[in-house]
């Protein structure tokens, strides 16, 4: 059975990477999610996709230039589906406290060696504190992040985010001891899927929003798909 992950919560239905979006995902019975993390100026894990604030909050500057106490007051509704109420940028901790997901894909964007190390250690500390070590996979396309995760937090599950095939994504994933391969759906051929699964990788494809494509990838046998529309996915595939 192909599992469903809500992309940034339910990005097509509610403001991405906000509490409202993750609650919307859970309303559909989808208890797996993908989200993006950046560090605040004071080292807290903030749930936001871009390194800058402009696209979702219309504020200036980078996430890393603002302290968490300020970031959680910024309304992140801009550019998404219409939403009546303000949707502030959440801390990861708030989501761990308020959302009962069975599994979390925590994507860490590219980072310097120092920031990568700080980020993966912070994730591990929070996952331990909230008892979700077995429910978390740290994913990234950044070699620095995956290297830091392998060396500093080897007991955290890891996943390679692969958008291009110019380097063999299966080989790269294996090189960092990954358990998951988060694959751009355009790269998901039956041959690559079979090879990855044969080598023990959970293959999670993104971002899949068309019902016909959902069915085709499920027929291929992908382990999971990541979608902006978890409600549509459950209606199409009949599972959460």
Language-model features: where?
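Hydrophobic faces of well-ordered beta-strands that scaffold small-molecule active sites
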Residues: 4-6, 33-35, 104-106, 136-138, ...
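Metal-dependent phosphodiesterase/phospholipase catalytic core, i.e.
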Residues: 49-160, 179, 199
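C-terminal active-site rim and adjoining tail of enzyme catalytic domains
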Residues: 82, 159-240
